[in-house]
A protein has these predicted regions:
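Flexible glycine/acidic-rich beta-alpha junction loops that bind and position SAM and/or redox cofactors
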Residues: 277, 281-282, 311-318, 334-358, ...
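A general alpha-helix detector
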Residues: 96-100, 104, 113, 117, ...
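Short, conserved phosphate-binding/catalytic loop or strand-edge motifs used
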Residues: 94-99, 133-136, 167
Length: 474
């Protein structure tokens, strides 16, 4: 990339370069000049492309503290104006769109004014603004800064899916030899963190086992970990306890019964696609008969059940996707999460190929909408990613009262997170001003060997971060 940027005021060049790479790649070998002018109560951006020998202007009223870094945002928007590019999400890229709307509301906008800014300034379409508003209204009913959430990462899977970029290692691969020591280290970390939380000012409101595939844990280890958790964590304020039991090839009825015994009330059962050829291509084993058995038993045990599907898997056609969607009628699920595949650099899929079939966006969205209406579900959380396919958002739908609090808190980065296990990211969220949060993070090693070796040191450093929260707030 040989993009050259010139401006008459200081801006974040790296941010503009990344925006150009994803949203305006025609300009990557160009020389771009931005002239930023402030006139009365307006900000004006004049942008010129040397390669295209074109220029344009974008001006907007100075919004003050209602948005973060208006000049930088306007520089990015002016590039879309220069190329006459139209996206459903306008200039919003790789961000949590609902946080943009929530900030506008925090800083004094009503929904009418916020919609105008999203449409006229950020260039978002009415359809996506409607989605944002629906999600934010539900989130505002459930967001809670007065508690924390607990995340436990199990970095093992039966096989590594090619699209996956998460902390995960094949249980039967070389790293699998650290499994037993990992479990022992996790039990120790639960004890250490539990002791600290007894002195911490905020109680836990949600618990989430992720990974990896947490249900890769052997039955006896699953019981040991869950028992240790309940022995050391105050459950009095816990509203939900989720276990990401995503793969049927890691599950049996006994494991479901153990989860239920130790207060897990939500699980995910994630086919991702019902097309067996697709699942083979991405190295994901799937037995439909066992999946249906597990689903049936989970319903008997009265778990709240989420199901994940991915749109845009390699070589999947519109017909393949519609076939998967049509089969949802056979499952009485409480949540449905639709992911649009984003090629992550850490995934094998990114390294092997970036080719995907063209699919009929409008037809697929129409079918999704029909399904969620039939199941009495509404969107309750969403997020976007870079490198995502054309229309680009991941949406969680839920029946009323079955929303995942953890998902909302994590996407909105509203609540402190204490993370244990492999790859877990702990967060301290400090609300500074005008809806802008300062977030301090601490990352557990995703590599099991490193996690085991550095457990004591890492626990000490992580707890020290939480102890500093009072200093940052003062």
């Amino acid at each position: 990339m040989n993009l050259l940027i010139e401006t008459n005021v200081e801006v974040n060049f790296r941010s503009i370069e990344e925006f150009t790479r994803v949203m305006a790649s025609e300009l990557l070998e160009d020389k771009i000049n931005f002239e930023i002018l402030k006139e009365d109560n307006f900000i004006k951006i004049k942008v010129k492309s040397e390669k295209l020998n074109q220029s344009t202007e974008f001006s907007y009223v100075d919004l003050g503290n209602k948005i973060e870094d208006q000049v930088l945002t306007m520089c990015k928007i002016s590039l879309l104006e220069l190329l006459d590019k139209k996206y459903d999400w306008g200039s919003l890229m790789g961000v949590r769109p609902t946080k943009v709307l929530r900030r506008l509301l925090i800083n004094g906008c009503d929904y009418k004014e916020a919609r105008k800014i999203l449409k006229d300034f950020y260039l978002v379409t009415d359809e996506k603004i409607n989605l944002m508003e629906t999600v934010v209204k539900k989130e505002l009913e459930l967001l809670d800064k007065e508690h924390i959430n607990l995340y436990i990462g199990i970095p093992f899977c039966p096989t590594k899916c090619k699209y996956c970029s998460f902390a995960s290692y094949e249980i039967n691969g070389g790293v699998g030899r650290f499994y037993n020591d990992f479990v022992e280290a996790l039990l120790k970390e639960i004890q250490i963190v539990g002791d600290f939380l007894k002195t911490y000012s905020k109680k836990v409101s949600s618990i989430y086992f992720g990974g990896g595939t947490p249900s890769t844990l052997m039955e006896e280890d699953l019981e040991r970990v869950l028992r240790k958790l309940l022995e050391n964590i105050d459950m009095s304020d816990v509203k939900e306890f989720t276990f990401e039991a995503g793969r049927e090839d890691s599950l049996n009825v006994k494991k479901l019964e153990i989860m239920k015994k130790y207060s897990v009330d939500r699980i995910s059962l994630n086919p991702q696609s019902f097309n067996l050829e697709t699942l083979k291509r991405v190295n994901r084993r799937f037995n439909r008969e066992n999946f249906d058995l597990i689903f049936k038993e989970a319903k008997k045990l009265e778990f709240i059940i989420n199901m994940d599907l991915i749109i845009g898997l390699p070589e999947e056609t519109t017909e393949d996707i519609l076939n998967t969607l049509s089969q949802l009628k056979d499952y009485d699920i409480d949540n449905l999460t639709i992911h649009c595949l984003a090629f992550k650099r850490a995934s094998k899929l990114f390294k092997e190929s970036q080719e995907r079939n063209s699919i009929d966006r409008a037809l697929i969205e129409k079918h999704i909408q029909k399904i969620v209406e039939e199941k009495a579900m509404k969107p309750y959380y969403m997020y976007r990613q870079k490198n995502i396919i054309e229309w680009g958002e991941n949406i969680g739908y839920s029946k009323e009262g079955k929303e995942s609090i953890f998902n909302i808190e994590m996407i909105e980065e509203n609540q402190n997170t204490m993370a244990l296990g492999g790859g877990g990211i702990s967060k301290i969220v400090i609300e500074e001003r005008n809806g802008i949060d300062y977030i301090e993070r601490y990352v557990n090693p995703k590599d099991p060997a490193l996690y085991i070796r550095e457990l004591d040191k890492r626990c000490k450093e992580k707890i020290e971060m939480f102890k500093k929260e009072k200093i940052w707030k003062s």
